Amino acid sequence: MTTSNTPTYASQARPWLKFYDQKYIDQTMPACTAFELVCRQNKNRLGETALEYYGRKFTYADFIVNVKKTAAALRAAGLKKGDIATVVSVMTPEIIFAFYAADMIGATLNLVDPRYSVEGIREYIEEVDSHLLICLNVVYERCHQAAKRTHVEHVVVLSPADSLPLPLALGYKIKNLDKNKYHSNVIHWKQFLAAGKDESIAAEPYDPEHACVVVHTGGTTGSPKGVMLTDNNFNGIAMQFSACDTLFSKGQSLLNIMPPFIAYGFACGVHLPLTLGIKVVIIPNLDSNKLGSLIWKYKPEHMFGVPSHYQQLAVDPKLQNKDLSFIRNYAAGGDAIARGAEQTVNDFLAAHNVEFPIAKGYGMTEASSAATAAAGRNNKPGSVGLPLVNTLVSAFEPGTDTELPIGQRGELCISGPGVMKGYYNKPAETAAILRTHADGRVWVHTGDIGYLDEDGFVYLDSRIKRLIIRHDGFKVFPSMIENVVSQHPAVHQCSVVGCADKDHVQGRLPFVYLVLDPAVPAAKRKQIIKELRQLCIEELPEYVQPVGYKIIPEMPLTLAAKFDYRKLEEEITPRDY
């Protein structure tokens, strides 16, 4: 037991290691490129399926051939070691080939959300000084406008139909006529590949400093920044998940519903499964209303999503009478899941013969998406899991390297293989978040408040910037209220934000946004809010009581599919409370 007389520190005690096999605790991270690791791990499985895209299957042998063809084409287009190409696309086989091809030749992909405005895309192109742009045909005109007044010389255009089976490709092209007026610097994907037929496919030597990608932070707590993630980062995430060997097995499948322009989408949704010999089923542009049908069609053992995906599955009528015992590890990351929502999802899974509860994780772009995992039996309600086997997580006095004992709340910091190289061309911002502590390790200062229990499970309270500080100095964690409100059976989703205190010059008060279950009649809304007020009075201290409640049809989301807290704050009016 931890006592006040004998404080125990997580970075020294590492209590979570009792849940891992010694061979994984002692493993050495591979010193190779991300592409090399996938090839090594599957050298005896070349005939097995690596990727599936609307029924078209690519074996590992096909995958390797396509990566090398793409590498030659990138070289023919002028991309060389150290260069950065900008990619504006959803997830398709071509984007996966381009990722590993750029990695193979020592180049980097700058991954940009295709929903960005012309100015947004232009800023990201200029930030990394790309001379090559790869984009979807459906966003070509926006990308063309964005590329003006930049150094882009060549634009490679791909279509979602490029890898479809022939009948589907023909149907797609008929239904979605390409009306773009392409300019002289454009080359289409198949022409792009053909242009590289005489180029070398020799791989560049492994460089531990090489950044595979630049991915951009969501901007929910500040201006977006380009995060450089290396081969070691991607390989570190994949190899640490191999320690979950009771869940992950060669020959299984993973439904990839996350986009390529967030670290979670590529690190966990592509490189992790390919490294572990798990087939990736690519869904390029998810319609969340069809998620249940997709799961039933493909029956994937694994999926990485966000909490709202699983909340939707739990009420999907298409799955209500289905046996889902094929599910092994469905993980909710990217945002916190309230305890009531977690219980609802777990009740649904148990009722449909799923062996394990919803898996959860915690991380951030700057940690290559994942630092903890609550998976299989190693799962506690309300926690975000155990640190990955070769990763350290501990609580510190905010903004310092003073570690706090296990059980005490502080700023969660992360050290391990997933820690980013840094922000692109932002040394001051990098120095603010990556700090070398007295132990000599580099730690990511997350800006999140939380703690570890005696078993090493991590609990997340809130981002420091989401803390609601009252006029009297009392601090309110939004999660305290969300965990209570979400227990009400009528509440589908909830989010707590701060609003102005009308009675004091300074300070903020908690305000609750609600999305109710669709089956709840409008006539019962006032009664439900009354019940929620009473629930909070019974379970929360006086200083934590919400000042108001507002029912909305759906939660606004950021581009990374997280609840947009800033937008919710902006929409509160004095009449709401």
Language-model features: where?
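AMP-binding/adenylate-forming catalytic core of the ANL superfamily
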Residues: Y116, L133-C135, M303, G416, ...
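N-lobe entry segment of adenylate-forming
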Residues: M1-F58, D62-A77, K81, D162-K181, ...
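AMP-binding/adenylate-forming catalytic domain of the ANL superfamily
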Residues: L158, E538-F563
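Conserved AMP-binding A3 loop
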Residues: T59-A61, C212-M239
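Gly/Ser/Thr-rich phosphate-binding loop
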Residues: E301-G305, A314-P381, L392
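Conserved AMP-binding/adenylate-forming
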Residues: Y53-F58, T70-Y116, V128, N137, ...
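Conserved pre-ATP/AMP-binding loop-to-beta segment of ANL
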Residues: K179-H216, S223, T246-S253
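Conserved AMP-binding/adenylation subdomain of ANL enzymes
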Residues: N235-S253, F261-F304, S308, Q312, ...
